[in-house]
């Protein structure tokens, strides 16, 4: 009996020590936010690429240096989404000057392109005719000329090594390979890179890109001119023309990235959002937020089931009004969209639209007055980064649909975009019986409309508060809006702001798409208000964000694509 009491006594003592230990230890573990860095942070959609950016910053590189090095890596590890055969937009905050600027390096239509070249065919989605003039490398060049600190060639070295020696297929690339399995296995040039024994690679298997490594080495040594007016130019044109394209040497010679010194901006309480204007979707994002800020959202807006259901109904209605107006946007160098953009950025206009939102019900598509129809655009990749000096970059890059044009050069290893598919065509018959948008028709040298919106938010003192953007085609703009709403208005930490289940509505089709883990209170509330909802079998977009936190910079790379941030 005594032995039994002795054992029980010892167990009790051990339990006391365990409980005391947990009380001391838990506050320092479970209470500590994930991925908070005291000095600098880089959030990409691939862990290794975030680490490359961090390493560049620790070497003394600028935030633009880090972004370029990370983007080159992302073009390998998520080659289905972006790469040097595509184009991008940078939004850059320079803490020394206190100014935000945008660099436009989006692809343009070749000079032999014309409005009716596709005639409702699939040629805009794959093959040489779908390839627009790439802008990626010219974009890197201009950004580096303005803000670079380390030598240009240094930024290429990590990706040259990765391409030459190989890297494991990550979650995002594995999903894309599985989705496009048939076309990849039937396309020899693609299968040489992305297959093993004739079957697409699986997650964790090693992929090498030796030809692309050689091309990156040439670009590192010779600069951007090698691509546009140098040793790589003739082969690029040959590859595209042999695949049925119309690109010429002159198209590459004449391509220039554009500096925009006064991007769009909007006041959000004591903060200011900066974002690119058309042909990107900054005006759409601004209209969504302008409509919604009149509701004075706060943590209370999602505190009860009733409030949460109403709040999400209002959000979806704002999406629908904004996407109706998106159909009138196009490249401002070719079409006069100044009045449309003025309206979309006007608080008075947003107030008028907000007054048309009824809290009891949604409405048929015609209620929101869509002028035209715009087809979906494709996937992308996004990076958000902040450096020690408080400078920041939001960069969104794309080759459009998964694996772009499916034209991969067996000489240079470059995978080319299918950005021509982002234009509208007068001969395209859509299922909604809404006319295609003339503002987005093809013209030589024109840029197609895009959903991308790399965003930087500054506080009232001009310091970075949030850097955010997304990939995921037409769902990009709504997902960036939700991340901003979650962070600024609902008070979520950055991880929750990014990971919170999302929903999307672009008016046409007249369906609200929701992720499977979304709160049932939200879907029930939408149903009561006559929304048609569908659960997506996959996910809605992929967001990367960095937010100022008490301990420094809190960073989040969306788990939907398997990314992870890095910093120090």
From Swiss-Prot:
Pathways involved: Sulfur metabolism; glutathione metabolism; Lipid metabolism; leukotriene D4 biosynthesis
SUPFAM superfamilies given in the database record: N-terminal nucleophile aminohydrolases (Ntn hydrolases) (SSF56235)
Top-rank lineage group of the source organism: Eukaryota
Catalytic residues identified in the record: 380
GO MF term (any one): leukotriene C4 gamma-glutamyl transferase activity
Extracellular side: 27-568
Residue intervals annotated with topology Cytoplasmic: 1-4
Principal cellular location given in the protein's record: membrane
GO biological process, one term: response to alcohol
Activity control note: Activated by autocatalytic cleavage.
InterPro entries (UniProt xref): GGT_CS, GGT_lsub_C, GGT_peptidase, GGT_ssub, Ntn_hydrolases_N
PROSITE patterns found in the cross-reference section: G_GLU_TRANSPEPTIDASE (PS00462)
Transmembrane segments: 5-26
Catalytic activity as recorded in UniProt: an N-terminal (5-L-glutamyl)-[peptide] + an alpha-amino acid = 5-L-glutamyl amino acid + an N-terminal L-alpha-aminoacyl-[peptide]; glutathione + H2O = L-cysteinylglycine + L-glutamate; an S-substituted glutathione + H2O = an S-substituted L-cysteinylglycine + L-glutamate; leukotriene C4 + H2O = leukotriene D4 + L-glutamate
Subcellular compartments: Cell membrane
Disulfide bonds: 49-73, 191-195
Gene3D superfamilies, per database record: 1.10.246.130, 3.60.20.40
Function: Cleaves the gamma-glutamyl bond of extracellular glutathione (gamma-Glu-Cys-Gly), glutathione conjugates (such as maresin conjugate (13R)-S-glutathionyl-(14S)-hydroxy-(4Z,7Z,9E,11E,16Z,19Z)-docosahexaenoate, MCTR1) and other gamma-glutamyl compounds (such as leukotriene C4, LTC4). The metabolism of glutathione by GGT1 releases free glutamate and the dipeptide cysteinyl-glycine, which is hydrolyzed to cysteine and glycine by dipeptidases.
The protein's name: Glutathione hydrolase 1 proenzyme
Source organism per UniProt: Mus musculus
